[in-house]
C-alpha cells in the first residue's frame, strides 16, 4: 500500500510546496488536467483593443501587349519598338493587414509590405471606428512602417514594448490580427525558437518563431506575452499553400523599438555599422582554423579606419559574442549591433589564433562620404533618364548593399526613357564606361559628353558583372 499512499500524498505535497514557496510555484509543471485549464479572456480583453485592421488602396498599372507585336511581319519592319511601347491600363487594388497601436496619440506599427505604395490607408479599431491614416516612415529592410491616425480626438489604448531578449523558448504567446479579412482573431501558441535567421523573408533576418497560427492578413499584427506586452510584430509564415502550418515569424520588439525611435519623428533609419563583413563558421571552416566546434562569425573583410579596424579587430578573427549575447552567424551579429543606440559602447568577444579575447568599441553611424550628389542624366546617351548618386557606406546600408562597393549607382529610372529601353535597372552600379573606371558622377558626366561611336558600359547588378554595348 506504500505505492498507493505515495500517489495520494504527492499532489498534496506539491500543493504544499506551491503555497509555501511561491518562487517554486512560478516555474512548476502542471501535474493534473485541472491545473492546465485556463482562459486567456482577461488578457485578450486588455490587449485586443490596441490591435487594428488596416485597409489600403492603390492604383496599379497593368501592361498588355498585343499579339501582333510578336508577329514576324511586324517585327521585320518595327523590331522590338512595338514591344517597348506597351498598352497600359490602370486599376484600383485593395489590400488588408493588421497593425498595433504603440502610443495613445495614434502611432501604429505595421509591416512595410502592408502599406507599400498605398494611396489611401484606413484604420479600423476593435470598436469599429474608422480613421484615415498617413505613413510617418517606412523601412523596407526590416519590413516595418509607422502610421499616424489623422484627426484623432482623445486617446487610444496601446501596447507597451517588452524587451524581446527576455523571451525564452516555450513561453506562451498570443497572436492577434485580421487573417483573411474575417475580422480580429486571437490564436495562442508558444515561442518555438529565438534568433531565427536565414529564412529569406527580408534583408535583415532575425525573428521570433512561433506556432501560434498566423495567416495572410495577420501581417503587422501583435505577438503578445502573457504580461500583456508586445514582444513582436507578426510578419510572415512558412507555408506552401498560403495557410498556417505552425511556423510563423515575428519581428522582435528590440528591432521594432529601434525603427520606431528613428521614424516616429519623421526621420529615416540610421543603422550602426561595424566596418566589417564576415560569415558564419561552418564545420569545414572550424576544422581549417583549429576550432573544436563551429561557432561565431569569421571576419573576412575590414573597412579601413572603420569601427572594427580602430578597435583592433583583424581579418581572421572569429566573433563569438556581443556583450552577454552569443552570435553564430552574420545576421545575429548585425542584429546585436543595429539594435543599440549610436554613441553607446559594446564589448566584442572573439577568438584569435585559438585564444579568447575581448575589446570594447563605440557604436557609430556609417559615413556619408562621398556625398551622394543625386543627379539626373540627360543628353544623347544610353543613360538618359536615370537618377544617379555616389555610393557611400551610408547609402549602401540604406539600400542593403555591401559597404565595400563604390562608384556610381542608379537610384531611379524615368518611365519610357532610353535607359529603361536599354535594360538598365534600379541599383545597377556603373563600374566602367568605354574601358575607363567610373569613380564618381562628375567623371561619368565627362565620359558621356565625349559622344563616341558606341558606348560599352560595365555594371554590377546584384553581384554579377554585365556589359552592355549601345551604338549611336
Per-region residue spans from a language model:
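Bacterial N-terminal signal peptides
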Residues: 11-20
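Serine-dependent protease modules
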Residues: 25-315, 321-347, 351-384, 389-394, ...
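Acidic- and glycine-rich mobile interface elements
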Residues: 298-303, 323, 404-421, 428-437
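Short, low-complexity, Pro/Ser/Thr/Gly-rich segments in the mature regions of secreted, periplasmic
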Residues: 463-471
Amino acid at each position: 500500500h506504500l505505492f498507493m499512499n505515495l500517489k495520494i500524498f504527492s499532489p498534496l505535497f506539491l500543493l504544499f510546496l506551491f503555497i509555501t514557496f511561491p518562487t517554486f510555484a512560478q516555474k512548476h509543471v502542471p501535474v493534473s488536467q485541472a491545473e492546465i485549464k485556463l482562459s486567456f479572456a482577461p488578457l485578450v480583453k486588455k490587449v485586443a483593443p490596441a490591435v487594428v485592421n488596416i485597409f489600403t488602396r492603390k492604383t496599379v498599372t497593368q501592361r498588355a501587349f498585343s499579339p501582333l507585336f510578336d508577329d514576324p511581319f511586324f517585327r521585320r519592319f518595327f523590331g522590338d519598338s512595338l514591344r517597348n511601347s506597351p498598352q497600359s491600363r490602370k486599376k484600383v487594388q485593395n489590400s488588408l493587414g493588421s497593425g498595433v497601436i504603440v502610443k495613445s496619440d495614434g502611432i501604429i506599427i505595421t509591416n512595410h509590405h502592408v502599406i507599400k505604395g498605398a494611396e489611401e490607408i484606413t484604420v479600423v479599431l476593435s470598436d469599429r471606428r474608422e480613421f484615415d491614416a498617413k505613413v510617418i516612415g517606412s523601412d523596407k529592410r526590416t519590413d516595418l512602417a509607422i502610421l499616424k491616425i489623422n484627426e484623432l480626438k482623445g486617446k487610444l489604448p496601446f501596447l507597451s514594448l517588452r524587451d524581446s531578449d527576455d523571451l525564452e523558448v516555450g513561453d506562451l504567446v498570443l497572436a492577434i490580427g485580421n487573417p483573411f479579412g474575417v475580422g480580429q482573431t486571437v490564436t495562442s501558441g508558444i515561442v518555438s525558437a529565438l534568433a531565427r535567421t536565414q529564412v529569406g523573408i527580408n534583408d535583415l533576418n532575425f525573428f521570433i518563431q512561433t506556432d501560434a497560427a498566423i495567416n495572410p492578413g495577420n501581417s503587422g499584427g501583435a505577438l503578445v506575452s502573457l504580461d500583456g506586452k508586445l514582444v513582436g510584430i507578426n510578419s510572415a509564415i512558412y507555408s506552401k499553400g498560403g495557410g498556417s502550418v505552425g511556423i510563423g515569424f515575428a519581428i522582435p520588439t528590440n528591432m521594432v523599438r529601434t525603427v520606431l525611435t528613428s521614424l516616429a519623428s519623421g526621420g529615416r533609419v540610421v543603422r550602426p555599422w561595424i566596418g566589417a563583413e564576415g560569415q558564419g563558421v561552418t564545420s569545414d571552416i572550424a576544422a581549417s582554423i583549429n576550432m573544436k566546434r563551429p561557432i561565431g562569425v569569421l571576419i573576412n573583410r575590414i573597412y579601413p579606419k572603420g569601427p572594427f579596424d580602430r578597435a583592433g579587430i583583424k581579418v581572421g578573427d572569429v566573433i563569438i559574442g556581443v556583450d552577454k549575447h552569443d552570435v553564430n552567424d552574420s545576421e545575429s551579429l548585425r542584429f546585436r549591433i543595429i539594435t543599440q543606440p549610436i554613441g553607446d559602447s559594446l564589448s566584442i568577444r572573439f577568438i584569435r589564433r585559438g585564444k579568447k579575447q575581448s575589446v570594447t568599441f563605440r557604436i557609430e553611424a556609417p559615413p556619408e562620404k562621398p556625398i551622394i550628389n543625386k543627379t539626373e542624366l540627360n543628353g544623347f546617351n544610353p543613360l538618359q533618364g536615370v537618377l544617379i548618386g555616389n555610393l557611400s557606406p551610408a547609402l549602401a546600408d540604406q539600400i542593403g548593399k555591401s559597404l565595400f562597393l563604390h562608384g556610381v549607382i542608379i537610384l531611379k529610372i524615368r518611365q519610357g526613357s532610353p535607359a529603361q529601353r536599354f535594360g538598365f535597372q534600379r541599383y545597377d552600379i556603373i563600374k566602367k564606361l568605354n574601358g575607363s573606371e567610373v569613380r564618381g558622377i562628375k567623371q561619368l558626366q565627362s565620359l558621356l559628353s565625349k559622344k563616341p561611336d558606341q558606348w560599352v558600359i560595365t555594371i554590377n547588378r546584384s553581384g554579377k558583372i554585365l556589359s552592355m554595348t549601345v551604338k549611336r
